[in-house]
Amino acid sequence: MNKFKSSLVAILLIITSGFTYSQTMFKVELDDVLNGKIKIEPAVPANGEVAEGTVFTVTAIPDNGYVLDAGYYSVKGMWGSMYNESMSSPFKVTVSQDLHIGASFIPKSEVDHINVTQNVVYAQPGVKPLKYDVYSPKGAKNLPVIVIIHGGGWSSNTEDIMRGMARELTKDGKYVVFSIDYRWRNKLDGGDQNVTMANIIEDVFGAIAHIMEHAKEYGGDPTRIAVTGDSAGGHLSAVAGTMPNKIGDGGFGKTPGVFEFMPSYMPKGKTVEQVRDEMMAAIQAAAPSYGVFGGNLLNHYSDDPKADDTWKEGVAPLSNIPNVSERAIPHYLTRGTKDMLIKDEAVKTYVDALVDAGQRVEYVQVGGASHAFFDWKPDARTKETFKKYGVYYIHEMEAFFNSVFYPEK
């Protein structure tokens, strides 16, 4: 009997040993943390080798005078490190690939002036809940609203990447800022349904419809809205500025020559015509940064065999600028002189089209800046770029918004 038990134990040890040996291991590294520290349970082994499925609990602890900006884990992405962030502590990280773990802290003075509301869900047309964050100056009442739309090739990032801009735009206490998220193109959200550019635009209009419905809860005026965004968000903010007249229930390309957008969120009791008319009146300024404006540079991302170049024009601000006699939508455009993705000529083409339509437009080139200088991430390089180029031109943008919403008498 004892011999039998010994054999059984030996077999189990062999099986267990084989199972352990076959486990997939990944490298987990801890980033240097400034102005605070992180506590991780269980501890990361000295060699950084961690089994797939391991769950870490990370607690971020700021130094005196600082607050948590974000805890995160980062992985390699198409354009460098991609950050998965948590604005609260503790947070959990489940290991499924090589990754870095860290935290970013900022001076408390950066957020003392505002109330921040995270992750307000406005719709869920696919697998991903669509949400926005609100940055409201303390004591805000009936302030104009700024809606920020993030970039990332319509295929990455969330509203979190624009939080630096949101904080800056609220420092003078003149605006309530909403930073929105949207679906990613094709099936990059992990769903079975293909997401087209028209769907993404419907998310933008849905977010704005939800914001208009709830703006007063945060001290905002739903009848006075500005839109801004960078890169892909530059395109989408230009769409929001120039094309709310295309909101409708006629479908996008289903009928030849008809390209309309049904917002992914519709307020109860309102018709699509009401939402369209209210949004056309409310959106009064646009500040797209280093965006794509022409249909020749856009993709409709549709798998419909009927999709052709007219579908690209249907999502192109350049092809849909209203004449100022119909609707005024002043623009403030920015681009870095060393931007290798967005060319000066492409922005100038949009500027010329706005001028031809009688619209007011200001185009500012930022000397020495490359792409995405309005973004905010936990890494030192992005923060330094934001400080060097972003902060100043955000306040120049705010001066433009002030000229619309706080005109000199």
Q: Where are the regions that the model predicts?
A:
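C-terminal catalytic histidine-bearing segment of alpha/beta-hydrolase fold enzymes
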Residues: 332-334, 345-351, 355-409
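N-terminal cap/lid segment of alpha/beta-hydrolase-fold proteins
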Residues: 108-140
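Short beta-strand/loop motif that positions the catalytic acidic residue
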Residues: 327, 332-335, 339
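Short amphipathic alpha-helix adjacent to the substrate-entry channel of hydrolases
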Residues: 160-179
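Surface-exposed interfaces of beta-sheet-rich extracellular modules
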Residues: 54-87
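Primarily recognizes the serine-hydrolase "nucleophile elbow" in alpha/beta-hydrolase
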Residues: 206-300, 315
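Alpha/beta-hydrolase active-site loop
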Residues: 194-216, 393-395
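Short beta-strand element of the alpha/beta-hydrolase
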Residues: 142-151
